[in-house]
């Protein structure tokens, strides 16, 4: 599928992510239409998915999505809780229309109901749990892209992306890879490293999120641990002293410029005269 182009080839970094998210781990049973995507079978009976075929089908699906003129006509659906967060994130970055949760029956076939929609392309997390939208899409000739495990039925599925669609991390990673390739084909991002992390597409347990929120609320605030002390503002007017600062600063310079003038400040003659006058006055006061 990459056409021997290095820019479209499967990178080692992506393979590492897939292995860490157990994308290659299938189930113990195999659908006869999924046998071509199985690499081997482990001794414990679990089938291993060929990641090379996974990447080829992922690029094919990304090309189909990027070819849609209006991104809002692409519908991403996941009734499984593990894929709802990934679907919402995928729709946010690719401008698709998400359906996270229960699918309203007749949304593609019943024109009377308010929830009626006419998408041009449908993407589902699991064709087994999302069988209702897949079946309705077959009635109105809507092509379907599905993330399929080794035991997933491929009835009414046009493009099957083989992967582990039962692991929360695998589901989030596959939606992240699909969103990245779509944005690359549209020219919105380069083929360098994408700034968005796959962690944003992973499922988060609501109970754990509530516990984290409760822990943040229960933790004392910083202002409670360190109460603020009243700030005393000194309103003394220092304008007079500031005006005298230049004269004080200039005094040492004047002293250094004229060191010979210092001895003149002390006049020994004046002292002698004072002492003489004082002695004379004492003598006159004695009456001798």
Swiss-Prot record:
**Keyword terms of this UniProt record:** Cytoplasm, Ribonucleoprotein, Ribosomal protein
Q: Which domain of life is it from?
A: Eukaryota
Check the record and name the HAMAP family matching this protein.
Answer: Ribosomal_S2_euk
Chief location bin: cytoplasm
Summarize subunit and interaction data from the UniProt record for this chain: Component of the small ribosomal subunit. Mature ribosomes consist of a small (40S) and a large (60S) subunit. The 40S subunit contains about 33 different proteins and 1 molecule of RNA (18S). The 60S subunit contains about 49 different proteins and 3 molecules of RNA (28S, 5.8S and 5S). Interacts with ribosomal protein S21.
A Pfam family cross-referenced in the UniProt record is: Ribosomal_S2
Gene Ontology CC annotations of this record: cytosolic small ribosomal subunit
Give the family per the record.
Answer: Belongs to the universal ribosomal protein uS2 family.
Q: Where in the cell is it found?
A: Cytoplasm
| Protein's UniProt name | Small ribosomal subunit protein uS2
GO molecular function terms noted in the UniProt entry: structural constituent of ribosome
Summarizing the function annotation, the protein's role is: Required for the assembly and/or stability of the 40S ribosomal subunit. Required for the processing of the 20S rRNA-precursor to mature 18S rRNA in a late step of the maturation of 40S ribosomal subunits.
Which GO biological process entries does UniProt record here? ribosomal small subunit assembly; translation
Gene3D superfamilies, per the entry: Glucose-6-phosphate isomerase like protein, domain 1
């Amino acid at each position: 599928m990459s056409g021997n182009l290095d820019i479209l080839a499967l990178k080692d970094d992506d393979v590492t992510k897939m292995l860490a998210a157990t994308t290659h781990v299938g189930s113990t049973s195999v659908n006869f239409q999924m046998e071509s995507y199985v690499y081997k079978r482990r001794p414990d009976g679990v089938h291993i998915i060929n990641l090379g075929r996974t990447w080829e089908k992922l690029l094919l699906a990304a090309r189909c999505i990027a070819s849609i003129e209006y991104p809002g006509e692409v519908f991403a659906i996941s009734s499984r809780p593990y894929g709802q967060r990934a679907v919402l994130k995928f729709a946010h970055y690719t401008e698709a229309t998400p359906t996270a949760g229960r699918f309203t029956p007749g949304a593609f076939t019943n024109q009377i109901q308010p929830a009626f929609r006419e998408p041009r392309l449908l993407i589902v997390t699991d064709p087994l749990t999302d069988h209702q939208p897949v079946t309705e899409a077959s009635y109105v000739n809507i092509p379907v892209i599905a993330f399929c495990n080794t035991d997933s039925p491929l009835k009414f599925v046009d493009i099957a992306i083989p992967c582990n669609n039962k692991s929360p991390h695998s589901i989030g990673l596959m939606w992240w890879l699909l969103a990245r390739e779509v944005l690359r084909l549209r020219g919105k991002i380069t083929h360098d490293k994408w700034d968005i992390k796959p962690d944003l597409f992973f499922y988060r347990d609501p109970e754990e999120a509530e516990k984290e929120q409760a822990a943040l609320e229960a933790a004392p605030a910083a202002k409670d641990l360190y109460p603020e002390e009243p700030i005393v503002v000194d309103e003394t007017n220092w304008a007079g002293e500031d005006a005298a600062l230049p004269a004080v600063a200039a005094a040492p310079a004047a002293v250094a410029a004229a060191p010979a003038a210092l001895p003149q400040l002390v006049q020994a003659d004046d002292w002698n005269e004072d002492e003489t006058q004082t002695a004379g006055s004492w003598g006159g006061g004695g009456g001798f």
